[in-house]
Amino acid sequence: GFSTLYINARIFDVKSDFHKTVGEKMAVRNEKGEPYRETYGPEHFTVNCPSDTLWRDYLLDTAEFCVKAYGCDGIYLDQLASAEPFACYCAEHSHENIGEFNNGYVYVLRELLRRLRKHNPNAYIMTENCGDIYGSYTWGNLTWNGAEYDEYYNVFKYTFPEFVQVNMVNPRGWE
């Protein structure tokens, strides 16, 4: 067998003790300067900016630490290939323009794979859902469909048979 550790690569819980000091700084900002917010079940989050070095470096360092300290084989980056990218208008962030969201994650995946393989040459990255822009850096994807969706995972599997696809079925609702 092999072990995979979980990291949410996208959101920050607003109830966290660190949201006011760190989470607010990492948040993607809309054109009014407000952070993008999302709700999953009863919990509320801000969306982190993957093209800003603050979040990017924290994510990379945490994932590398997991492989180095715990000896796990891979890292699962939740939401990375699944959720909507946003333009970030935060002038304090390190990105050069507002549209670098996806490029930020490409950098994370490329750099993370390089770092992980220093510690374990067989290390791998998994993400939630399939993103062809990210696929050359991942070993596999956790895929799922809601009742209203057909995101064509069978077509993806047919087109890219070398990718591992874990199909999740989760019938429980938030109610």
Name what the model sees in each region.
Residues 1-2, 65-73, 111-123:
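A structural motif corresponding to the C-terminal end of an alpha-helix
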Residues 2-18:
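Carboxylate/His-rich catalytic cores and anion/metal-binding grooves
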Residues 3-6, 75-77, 125-127:
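Hydrophobic faces of well-ordered beta-strands that scaffold small-molecule active sites
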Residues 13-45, 49-50, 103-175:
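Glycan-recognition surfaces
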Residues 40-60, 71, 90-105:
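The substrate-binding groove and active-site-proximal loops of carbohydrate-active enzymes
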Residues 59, 66, 78, 125:
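Conserved, mostly hydrophobic/aromatic
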Residues 76-98:
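Active-site-proximal loop/short-helix segments
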